[in-house]
Protein backbone atom coordinates (compact mmCIF):
# COMPACT_ATOMS: atom_id res chain seq x y z
CA UNK A 1 0.00 0.00 0.00
CA UNK A 2 1.29 3.44 -0.89
CA UNK A 3 1.84 5.90 1.93
CA UNK A 4 0.51 9.44 2.02
CA UNK A 5 0.58 11.57 5.15
CA UNK A 6 -0.86 14.89 3.88
CA UNK A 7 -3.95 15.64 1.82
CA UNK A 8 -6.16 18.62 1.05
CA UNK A 9 -9.90 18.04 0.76
CA UNK A 10 -13.04 20.08 0.09
CA UNK A 11 -16.10 19.44 2.24
CA UNK A 12 -19.63 20.81 1.94
CA UNK A 13 -22.61 19.95 4.10
CA UNK A 14 -26.05 19.59 2.59
CA UNK A 15 -28.44 22.49 2.05
CA UNK A 16 -31.67 22.44 3.98
CA UNK A 17 -34.80 21.35 2.15
CA UNK A 18 -37.31 23.95 0.96
CA UNK A 19 -40.57 24.68 2.71
CA UNK A 20 -43.70 24.45 0.53
CA UNK A 21 -46.91 26.36 -0.01
CA UNK A 22 -49.89 24.04 0.32
CA UNK A 23 -53.50 24.23 1.51
CA UNK A 24 -55.76 21.66 3.00
CA UNK A 25 -58.11 20.23 0.38
CA UNK A 26 -60.83 17.87 1.60
CA UNK A 27 -64.40 17.17 0.66
CA UNK A 28 -66.97 19.35 2.45
CA UNK A 29 -64.22 21.67 3.73
CA UNK A 30 -64.51 24.79 1.64
CA UNK A 31 -61.79 26.91 3.23
CA UNK A 32 -58.94 24.56 4.20
CA UNK A 33 -56.12 26.36 5.96
CA UNK A 34 -52.41 26.35 5.07
CA UNK A 35 -50.64 23.04 5.68
CA UNK A 36 -47.32 23.33 3.84
CA UNK A 37 -44.56 21.55 5.78
CA UNK A 38 -41.00 22.58 6.54
CA UNK A 39 -37.93 21.32 4.69
CA UNK A 40 -35.64 18.69 6.16
CA UNK A 41 -32.16 19.32 7.51
CA UNK A 42 -29.16 18.87 5.21
CA UNK A 43 -26.54 16.22 5.90
CA UNK A 44 -23.47 16.91 8.06
CA UNK A 45 -19.83 16.22 7.15
CA UNK A 46 -18.26 14.12 9.93
CA UNK A 47 -14.66 12.91 10.19
CA UNK A 48 -13.89 9.86 12.36
CA UNK A 49 -10.62 8.15 13.32
CA UNK A 50 -10.58 4.39 12.73
CA UNK A 51 -7.98 1.86 13.77
CA UNK A 52 -7.59 -0.14 10.55
CA UNK A 53 -6.10 2.64 8.39
CA UNK A 54 -2.51 3.90 8.32
CA UNK A 55 -2.34 6.16 5.26
CA UNK A 56 -4.23 9.02 3.62
CA UNK A 57 -3.72 7.57 0.13
CA UNK A 58 -7.49 7.38 -0.52
CA UNK A 59 -7.66 11.18 -0.49
CA UNK A 60 -5.30 11.41 -3.45
CA UNK A 61 -8.14 10.17 -5.65
CA UNK A 62 -11.20 11.46 -3.77
CA UNK A 63 -10.84 15.06 -2.65
CA UNK A 64 -14.40 16.43 -2.72
CA UNK A 65 -17.08 15.41 -0.22
CA UNK A 66 -20.62 16.76 -0.43
CA UNK A 67 -23.52 15.82 1.81
CA UNK A 68 -27.00 15.61 0.24
CA UNK A 69 -29.71 18.22 0.52
CA UNK A 70 -32.59 17.77 2.94
CA UNK A 71 -35.96 16.76 1.53
CA UNK A 72 -38.55 19.40 0.68
CA UNK A 73 -41.63 19.80 2.83
CA UNK A 74 -45.02 18.53 1.67
CA UNK A 75 -48.72 19.11 2.19
CA UNK A 76 -50.56 17.92 5.28
CA UNK A 77 -47.85 19.71 7.29
CA UNK A 78 -45.28 17.03 6.50
CA UNK A 79 -41.63 17.87 7.18
CA UNK A 80 -39.07 16.85 4.58
CA UNK A 81 -36.72 13.98 5.32
CA UNK A 82 -33.42 14.82 6.97
CA UNK A 83 -30.50 14.01 4.67
CA UNK A 84 -27.97 11.35 5.69
CA UNK A 85 -24.60 12.48 7.00
CA UNK A 86 -21.35 11.86 5.13
CA UNK A 87 -18.79 10.03 7.29
CA UNK A 88 -15.13 10.41 6.29
CA UNK A 89 -12.86 7.78 7.86
CA UNK A 90 -9.22 8.66 8.55
CA UNK A 91 -6.33 6.90 10.34
CA UNK A 92 -5.85 7.38 14.06
CA UNK A 93 -3.38 10.22 14.53
CA UNK A 94 -4.83 12.45 11.81
CA UNK A 95 -4.84 16.17 12.46
CA UNK A 96 -7.29 18.46 10.66
CA UNK A 97 -6.04 21.96 9.86
CA UNK A 98 -7.49 25.05 8.26
CA UNK A 99 -6.54 25.94 4.70
CA UNK A 100 -3.62 28.00 6.06
CA UNK A 101 -2.04 24.71 7.26
CA UNK A 102 -1.34 26.31 10.64
CA UNK A 103 -4.64 26.50 12.56
CA UNK A 104 -5.48 23.17 14.18
CA UNK A 105 -9.17 22.22 14.03
CA UNK A 106 -8.99 18.77 15.60
CA UNK A 107 -6.53 16.03 16.56
CA UNK A 108 -8.12 12.61 16.10
CA UNK A 109 -5.67 10.70 18.27
CA UNK A 110 -7.85 7.83 19.54
CA UNK A 111 -10.08 5.34 17.68
CA UNK A 112 -13.69 6.45 17.45
CA UNK A 113 -12.95 10.13 18.01
CA UNK A 114 -14.91 12.27 15.58
CA UNK A 115 -15.66 15.86 14.67
CA UNK A 116 -18.40 17.53 12.66
CA UNK A 117 -16.57 19.68 10.13
CA UNK A 118 -19.66 21.17 8.46
CA UNK A 119 -23.23 21.22 9.78
CA UNK A 120 -26.09 20.77 7.39
CA UNK A 121 -28.38 23.70 6.68
CA UNK A 122 -31.76 23.95 8.41
CA UNK A 123 -34.88 23.36 6.37
CA UNK A 124 -36.96 26.31 5.21
CA UNK A 125 -40.38 27.00 6.73
CA UNK A 126 -43.54 25.99 4.91
CA UNK A 127 -46.55 28.31 4.73
CA UNK A 128 -48.20 26.63 7.74
CA UNK A 129 -45.49 28.25 9.86
CA UNK A 130 -46.59 31.75 8.83
CA UNK A 131 -50.27 31.36 9.67
CA UNK A 132 -51.47 34.01 12.15
CA UNK A 133 -54.66 35.71 13.30
CA UNK A 134 -54.13 38.42 10.70
CA UNK A 135 -52.91 36.18 7.88
CA UNK A 136 -55.10 33.11 7.61
CA UNK A 137 -53.84 32.00 4.21
CA UNK A 138 -50.14 32.90 3.87
CA UNK A 139 -48.60 32.32 0.46
CA UNK A 140 -45.04 32.35 1.67
CA UNK A 141 -42.50 29.57 2.09
CA UNK A 142 -38.76 29.79 2.68
CA UNK A 143 -35.90 28.15 0.86
CA UNK A 144 -33.68 25.89 2.93
CA UNK A 145 -30.58 27.36 4.54
CA UNK A 146 -27.35 26.67 2.66
CA UNK A 147 -24.84 24.20 4.06
CA UNK A 148 -21.31 25.09 5.14
CA UNK A 149 -18.26 24.57 2.96
CA UNK A 150 -14.51 24.74 3.49
CA UNK A 151 -11.13 23.44 2.38
CA UNK A 152 -9.10 21.64 5.04
CA UNK A 153 -5.77 19.85 5.28
CA UNK A 154 -5.41 16.36 6.73
CA UNK A 155 -2.02 15.62 8.28
CA UNK A 156 -1.21 12.18 9.61
CA UNK A 157 1.09 11.73 12.58
CA UNK A 158 1.40 8.03 13.21
CA UNK A 159 0.70 6.72 16.69
CA UNK A 160 3.80 4.89 17.90
CA UNK A 161 5.29 4.28 21.34
CA UNK A 162 8.91 4.59 20.24
CA UNK A 163 10.61 6.11 17.22
CA UNK A 164 13.80 5.34 15.33
CA UNK A 165 15.85 8.34 14.18
CA UNK A 166 19.25 8.61 12.57
CA UNK A 167 21.18 9.32 9.40
CA UNK A 168 20.51 7.31 6.23
CA UNK A 169 22.13 3.85 6.35
CA UNK A 170 22.27 3.83 10.15
CA UNK A 171 20.55 0.43 10.13
CA UNK A 172 17.09 1.53 11.26
CA UNK A 173 15.17 -0.67 8.80
CA UNK A 174 17.30 -3.71 9.64
CA UNK A 175 16.69 -3.11 13.34
CA UNK A 176 12.92 -2.81 12.77
CA UNK A 177 12.84 -6.04 10.76
CA UNK A 178 14.78 -7.91 13.46
CA UNK A 179 12.67 -6.84 16.43
CA UNK A 180 9.22 -6.95 14.76
CA UNK A 181 7.29 -8.62 11.96
CA UNK A 182 7.61 -5.52 9.76
CA UNK A 183 9.40 -6.09 6.47
CA UNK A 184 10.75 -2.75 5.28
CA UNK A 185 12.94 -2.51 2.20
CA UNK A 186 16.59 -2.98 3.19
CA UNK A 187 19.58 -2.14 0.98
CA UNK A 188 23.11 -0.80 1.33
CA UNK A 189 22.43 2.70 0.01
CA UNK A 190 20.98 5.90 1.52
CA UNK A 191 17.24 6.65 1.51
CA UNK A 192 16.13 3.04 1.07
CA UNK A 193 13.26 3.97 3.38
CA UNK A 194 11.12 6.58 1.62
CA UNK A 195 8.19 6.68 4.04
CA UNK A 196 7.51 5.74 7.68
CA UNK A 197 7.20 2.09 8.67
CA UNK A 198 5.52 0.68 11.76
CA UNK A 199 6.24 -2.55 13.58
CA UNK A 200 4.92 -4.16 16.76
CA UNK A 201 7.64 -5.33 19.16
CA UNK A 202 6.45 -8.15 21.45
CA UNK A 203 8.59 -8.89 24.48
CA UNK A 204 6.04 -11.15 26.17
CA UNK A 205 2.31 -11.87 26.13
CA UNK A 206 1.70 -8.77 28.25
CA UNK A 207 4.47 -6.48 26.97
CA UNK A 208 4.50 -4.95 23.52
CA UNK A 209 4.96 -1.57 21.90
CA UNK A 210 4.72 0.04 18.45
CA UNK A 211 7.99 1.14 16.88
CA UNK A 212 8.17 3.70 14.04
CA UNK A 213 11.00 3.90 11.52
CA UNK A 214 11.21 7.16 9.56
CA UNK A 215 13.38 8.04 6.54
CA UNK A 216 16.92 9.07 7.42
CA UNK A 217 17.83 12.69 8.11
CA UNK A 218 20.75 14.53 6.58
CA UNK A 219 22.34 17.87 7.34
CA UNK A 220 19.95 20.66 6.32
CA UNK A 221 16.87 18.41 6.43
CA UNK A 222 14.85 21.01 8.35
CA UNK A 223 15.53 23.35 5.40
CA UNK A 224 14.37 20.77 2.86
CA UNK A 225 17.59 18.87 2.07
CA UNK A 226 17.23 15.19 1.19
CA UNK A 227 13.72 14.07 2.05
CA UNK A 228 13.38 17.04 4.40
CA UNK A 229 12.12 16.75 7.95
CA UNK A 230 8.40 16.32 7.26
CA UNK A 231 8.51 12.74 8.51
CA UNK A 232 9.74 13.86 11.94
CA UNK A 233 6.09 14.60 12.72
CA UNK A 234 5.53 10.85 12.93
CA UNK A 235 7.71 10.56 16.03
CA UNK A 236 6.26 13.60 17.84
CA UNK A 237 3.85 11.37 19.77
CA UNK A 238 6.48 8.79 20.78
CA UNK A 239 7.39 8.26 24.41
CA UNK A 240 11.05 7.66 23.61
CA UNK A 241 13.41 8.08 20.65
CA UNK A 242 16.00 5.46 19.70
CA UNK A 243 18.85 7.35 18.05
CA UNK A 244 20.67 4.81 15.90
CA UNK A 245 24.23 5.68 14.83
CA UNK A 246 26.29 3.72 12.32
CA UNK A 247 29.35 2.78 14.37
CA UNK A 248 31.25 1.55 11.31
CA UNK A 249 30.89 4.82 9.40
CA UNK A 250 33.63 6.84 11.11
CA UNK A 251 32.81 10.10 12.92
CA UNK A 252 30.03 8.98 15.26
CA UNK A 253 29.99 12.25 17.22
CA UNK A 254 29.33 14.27 14.07
CA UNK A 255 26.57 11.84 13.08
CA UNK A 256 24.88 12.25 16.46
CA UNK A 257 25.16 16.05 16.39
CA UNK A 258 23.80 16.28 12.84
CA UNK A 259 20.57 14.52 13.75
CA UNK A 260 20.21 16.44 17.02
CA UNK A 261 20.57 19.74 15.16
CA UNK A 262 17.92 18.71 12.65
CA UNK A 263 15.53 17.79 15.47
CA UNK A 264 16.16 21.16 17.10
CA UNK A 265 15.53 22.91 13.79
CA UNK A 266 12.26 21.03 13.39
CA UNK A 267 11.00 21.79 16.91
CA UNK A 268 7.89 20.00 18.13
CA UNK A 269 9.51 19.17 21.47
CA UNK A 270 11.58 16.34 19.99
CA UNK A 271 14.79 17.29 21.77
CA UNK A 272 12.98 17.18 25.13
CA UNK A 273 11.96 13.55 24.66
CA UNK A 274 13.92 10.74 26.29
CA UNK A 275 16.66 9.64 23.87
CA UNK A 276 18.44 6.30 23.89
CA UNK A 277 21.72 6.64 22.00
CA UNK A 278 22.61 3.40 20.23
CA UNK A 279 25.88 2.60 18.50
CA UNK A 280 24.86 0.12 15.80
CA UNK A 281 26.80 -2.32 13.59
CA UNK A 282 29.26 -3.39 16.27
CA UNK A 283 29.78 -6.53 14.16
CA UNK A 284 31.65 -4.31 11.68
CA UNK A 285 34.09 -2.95 14.29
CA UNK A 286 36.91 -4.36 16.35
CA UNK A 287 36.33 -4.35 20.13
CA UNK A 288 38.88 -1.54 20.46
CA UNK A 289 37.09 0.59 17.82
CA UNK A 290 33.71 -0.04 19.43
CA UNK A 291 35.02 0.96 22.86
CA UNK A 292 36.70 4.14 21.58
CA UNK A 293 33.66 5.29 19.60
CA UNK A 294 31.34 4.50 22.46
CA UNK A 295 33.47 6.58 24.84
CA UNK A 296 33.65 9.51 22.40
CA UNK A 297 29.90 9.46 21.92
CA UNK A 298 29.20 9.23 25.64
CA UNK A 299 31.52 12.17 26.31
CA UNK A 300 29.90 14.36 23.62
CA UNK A 301 26.32 13.54 24.58
CA UNK A 302 26.68 13.19 28.32
CA UNK A 303 24.60 10.02 28.16
CA UNK A 304 25.08 6.29 28.39
CA UNK A 305 25.60 4.71 24.97
CA UNK A 306 24.23 1.27 24.12
CA UNK A 307 26.19 -0.88 21.64
CA UNK A 308 24.29 -3.35 19.46
CA UNK A 309 24.33 -5.20 16.17
CA UNK A 310 21.04 -5.27 14.32
CA UNK A 311 22.35 -8.08 12.10
CA UNK A 312 23.61 -10.50 14.78
CA UNK A 313 21.16 -9.40 17.50
CA UNK A 314 23.92 -8.60 20.00
CA UNK A 315 22.65 -6.18 22.68
CA UNK A 316 19.18 -5.92 21.14
CA UNK A 317 17.11 -7.51 23.91
CA UNK A 318 18.48 -5.31 26.74
CA UNK A 319 17.82 -2.29 24.52
CA UNK A 320 14.20 -3.34 23.95
CA UNK A 321 13.76 -3.80 27.70
CA UNK A 322 15.03 -0.27 28.25
CA UNK A 323 12.57 1.06 25.65
CA UNK A 324 9.71 -0.86 27.27
CA UNK A 325 10.47 0.82 30.60
CA UNK A 326 10.02 4.28 29.05
CA UNK A 327 6.88 3.19 27.20
CA UNK A 328 5.28 1.70 30.32
CA UNK A 329 6.06 4.86 32.29
CA UNK A 330 4.53 7.05 29.57
CA UNK A 331 1.39 4.91 29.41
CA UNK A 332 0.96 5.11 33.18
CA UNK A 333 1.34 8.91 33.14
CA UNK A 334 -1.20 9.16 30.32
CA UNK A 335 -3.61 6.87 32.18
CA UNK A 336 -3.37 9.01 35.33
CA UNK A 337 -3.87 12.19 33.30
CA UNK A 338 -6.98 10.77 31.64
CA UNK A 339 -8.44 9.52 34.93
CA UNK A 340 -7.80 12.93 36.49
CA UNK A 341 -9.54 14.65 33.57
CA UNK A 342 -12.58 12.38 33.75
CA UNK A 343 -12.82 12.92 37.51
Curated annotation (Swiss-Prot):
* Pfam families reported in the protein's UniProt record: GTP1_OBG (PF01018), MMR_HSR1 (PF01926)
Ranges for the Obg domain?
1-159
Residues where Mg(2+) binds: 173, 193
Superkingdom is Bacteria
Could you cite one Gene Ontology molecular function of this protein? Answer: GTPase activity
Query: What InterPro entries does the database record attribute to this sequence?
Result: G_OBG, GTP-bd, GTP-bd_Obg/CgtA, GTP1-OBG_CS, GTP1_OBG_dom, GTP1_OBG_dom_sf, OBG_GTPase, P-loop_NTPase
Residue numbers binding GTP: 166-173, 191-195, 213-216, 280-283, 309-311
Keyword annotations of the record = Cytoplasm, GTP-binding, Hydrolase, Magnesium, Metal-binding, Nucleotide-binding
Residues annotated as coiled-coil are: none
Task: For this entry, list what GO says about its biological process.
Answer: ribosome biogenesis
Cofactor(s) needed? Mg(2+)
> Is ATP-binding included in the keywords of this UniProt record?
no
Q: Domain OBG-type G, which positions?
A: 160-328
Disulfide bridges in this chain: none
Q: Which NCBIfam families match?
A: Obg_CgtA, PRK12297.1, PRK12299.1
The name on file for this protein is GTPase Obg
User: Which species is this UniProt entry from?
Assistant: Granulibacter bethesdensis (strain ATCC BAA-1260 / CGDNIH1)
The lineage, from the top, is: Bacteria, Pseudomonadati, Pseudomonadota, Alphaproteobacteria, Acetobacterales
